[in-house]
Amino acid sequence: MSADPRHYDIIVSPVITEKATNLTEQNKVVFRVAPKATKPQIKEAVERLFDVKVTGVNTLTTKGKKKFFRGQRGQRSDVKKAIVTLAEGDTIDVTTGL
């Protein structure tokens, strides 16, 4: 399968945290994705970019926190994450580049 340039716009970056690393034991990988990306788009992008079979996609949107920037109140951007479940036997090493 070949990757389309728009797939690189859907998958922003992998999430590398302790919780995300623990999910790899359950054959799941966590990615930051574009805010308007849909589950079918995320599934297609991961399958084409990493050459794996995706069995499920769960998404969540983390609302941005209110913070002070140089004495003025501001708000961080919302972040959309996707938890991608891979087929048995497929793995993605997120520590390496695409």
UniProtKB/Swiss-Prot annotation:
<keyword id="KW-0687">Ribonucleoprotein</keyword>
<protein>
    <recommendedName>
        <fullName>Large ribosomal subunit protein uL23</fullName>
    </recommendedName>
</protein>
<dbReference type="InterPro" id="IPR013025">
    <property type="entry name" value="Ribosomal_uL23-like"/>
</dbReference>
<dbReference type="Pfam" id="PF00276">
    <property type="entry name" value="Ribosomal_L23"/>
</dbReference>
<comment type="subunit">
    <text>Part of the 50S ribosomal subunit. Contacts protein L29, and trigger factor when it is bound to the ribosome.</text>
</comment>
<dbReference type="InterPro" id="IPR012678">
    <property type="entry name" value="Ribosomal_uL23/eL15/eS24_sf"/>
</dbReference>
<comment type="function">
    <text>One of the early assembly proteins it binds 23S rRNA. One of the proteins that surrounds the polypeptide exit tunnel on the outside of the ribosome. Forms the main docking site for trigger factor binding to the ribosome.</text>
</comment>
<dbReference type="InterPro" id="IPR001014">
    <property type="entry name" value="Ribosomal_uL23_CS"/>
</dbReference>
<keyword id="KW-0694">RNA-binding</keyword>
<keyword id="KW-0689">Ribosomal protein</keyword>
<dbReference type="GO" id="GO:0003735">
    <property type="term" value="F:structural constituent of ribosome"/>
</dbReference>
<dbReference type="GO" id="GO:1990904">
    <property type="term" value="C:ribonucleoprotein complex"/>
</dbReference>
<dbReference type="GO" id="GO:0019843">
    <property type="term" value="F:rRNA binding"/>
</dbReference>
<dbReference type="GO" id="GO:0005840">
    <property type="term" value="C:ribosome"/>
</dbReference>
<comment type="similarity">
    <text>Belongs to the universal ribosomal protein uL23 family.</text>
</comment>
<dbReference type="InterPro" id="IPR012677">
    <property type="entry name" value="Nucleotide-bd_a/b_plait_sf"/>
</dbReference>
<dbReference type="GO" id="GO:0006412">
    <property type="term" value="P:translation"/>
</dbReference>
<keyword id="KW-0699">rRNA-binding</keyword>
